[in-house]
Amino acid sequence: MNSPQNVSTKKVTVTGAAGQISYSLLWRIANGEVFGTDTPVELKLLEIPQALGGAEGVAMELLDSAFPLLRNITITADANEAFDGANAAFLVGAKPRGKGEERADLLANNGKIFGPQGKAINDNAADDIRVLVVGNPANTNALIASAAAPDVPASRFNAMMRLDHNRAISQLATKLGRGSAEFNNIVVWGNHSATQFPDITYATVGGEKVTDLVDHDWYVEEFIPRVANRGAEIIEVRGKSSAASAASSAIDHMRDWVQGTEAWSSAAIPSTGAYGIPEGIFVGLPTVSRNGEWEIVEGLEISDFQRARIDANAQELQAEREAVRDLL
């Protein structure tokens, strides 16, 4: 194993760096959980001007944690500086939906954030940049950012479905009394919204088909809506949105993207037309990670039940795209 002194430092940009998700995320990155425990990291924290004080406090705490792999921290409100030389970026900062605000307005307001950030990535990031959009509405925010970065392959932009994926595993593990690591071949199709389709059609646990172990009515009437609405449930109980679980899922996604995995995951990537899903949207698909790239798990048989739910997600994402067409 190479010592940290002999491995090139990876620059990681985190937007919304003073927020709750980043407060959990940054410690995991600094601890080597994305690039490995032999790879030094430099953190670049992007915030809006009025939140720079909060980001400064976060940086102070990171330094006080004395991570052996943490080489430097930059705090800035300038996107060009934040993405300069970045090898990985977590786009966490987003404008939350205001009371009574229409989804079209939410999309447009976030377009004003993710468009300029996409351009800054295009102009400044390293050639091997990987961008994970966490801030919602994540799928269409990823589309906007990618459209503003024509020199960066669209496959270098992802939106996070891993939280939904992990929630699906958790619900099954609780239902069946099994460990989360025992489950394989779960997928969450579509949009990171209440329309999403957590799918257990191909799932196994300990060599058994999950569909043989759970009741179909429970699957349709409890499991799917519970996973899809878990974020709202946590807000109702906690009084705040999911933060630590979102950060943990973002780490899972980026680690697997960088280091590779043959285990199925769910990632929102640019549609290639696979499974009859139209191109031009970022959609959750069953994936594995090989050679630093996500590959779609192909050849799966799709039932009419699945088809209807996958199509509903594609239509929702196409409608979101139309709402921000002037930004693309």
Curated annotation (Swiss-Prot):
InterPro entries: L-lactate/malate_DH (IPR001557), Lactate/malate_DH_C (IPR022383), Lactate/malate_DH_N (IPR001236), Lactate_DH/Glyco_Ohase_4_C (IPR015955), Malate_DH_type2 (IPR010945), NAD(P)-bd_dom_sf (IPR036291). Citrate activates the enzyme in the oxidation of malate to oxaloacetate and inhibits it in the reverse reaction. CDD domains: MDH_chloroplast-like. Keywords: NAD, Oxidoreductase, Tricarboxylic acid cycle. Homotetramer. GO terms for molecular function: L-malate dehydrogenase (NAD+) activity. Catalyzes the reversible oxidation of malate to oxaloacetate. Exhibits higher catalytic efficiency for oxaloacetate reduction than for malate oxidation in vitro. Almost equally active both for NADH and NADPH on the bases of the kcat values at pH 6.5, but catalytic efficiency for oxaloacetate reduction is 50-fold higher with NADH. Substrate binds at R97, R103, N136, R167. The lineage of its organism: Bacteria, Bacillati, Actinomycetota, Actinomycetes, Mycobacteriales. The active site is at H192. It catalyses: (S)-malate + NAD(+) = oxaloacetate + NADH + H(+). Belongs to the LDH/MDH superfamily. MDH type 2 family. It comes from the Bacteria. The keyword NAD applies. NAD(+) binds at G16, A17, A18, G19, Q20, I21, S22, N110, Q117, V134, G135, N136. Transmembrane segments: none annotated. GO terms for biological process: malate metabolic process; tricarboxylic acid cycle. This is Malate dehydrogenase. Its EC number is 1.1.1.37.
